[in-house]
Amino acid sequence: VPVVVVRGKSLTTNVDKMMELLGQILNHTDYRDTNRLKELLMEEKAAWDMSLFERGHSLVMQRLMSYYSKVAKFKEQGSLSYYYFLNELVATFDENSSIIIDKLKQVASKIFVKNNLTIQEVGGIEERAAVSKHIHLLIDDMLEGVPCNSTYFVFEDSVVNEGFLSSGKVQYVARGGNFRQHGFSYTGALRVLETIVRFDYLWKNVRVLGGAYGAFTQFATNGD
């Protein structure tokens, strides 16, 4: 289930301050500060630019699985697709800042409301009592809102072969599918096969003989 999680931690004696701070952030954030908003977007993009090559293999695998798995397609929206979305936001921010601000306000008014709020507390009896006592600092100014109905996103399967150009010299190549869609089921034997393929075949032929940085395979219980 897709959720937005806002976390905070404090000493028991400071729970009131934490609740007040969370309340200010959720209920009174000023989205009209275009300079600060642009700074945050550029910081987010810079972080992705720096880490993109470090997790190239995972990005490629997520993109690959999104071709044939609806769940993976949804998860991939926060991966490489998100990076391209972020690039577009930064590149067009000056001319589209008012639209972006309106969208943020709309999303906040739907998410940060009492009717969609779930509170989880970790601690002992004293901590729970402190949270119960000061929770009003978080929710007093929160809109009532309306319960959000479940929205089903339709993701069509797409058989795509694609490549992405980067300034790095390391290539990440992936190939995969879902074996359950071909009539096979998951058993413990696949763990053995995974080890054999990874270390006896791929390691020797791709890593040792081919000179690549590494190669691996994996079989998930859902068939991916």
Residue ranges: model-predicted function:
Residues 71, 100-135:
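Non-catalytic, conformational "gating/processing" segments within enzyme and secreted inhibitor domains
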Residues 7-12, 116, 120, 125, ...:
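His/Glu-based metal-binding/catalytic segments typifying zinc-dependent metallopeptidases
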Residues 97-107, 207-215:
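Short amphipathic beta-strand starts and helix->beta connectors
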Residues 28-35, 50-58, 73-74, 110-117, ...:
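Intrinsically disordered or highly flexible coil/loop and linker segments, enriched in small
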Residues 2-105:
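Acidic/histidine-enriched segments that form metal/cofactor-coordinating
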Residues 2-3, 19-20, 81-85, 112-116, ...:
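Short acidic (Asp/Glu) and glycine-rich catalytic loops that position anionic groups and cofactors
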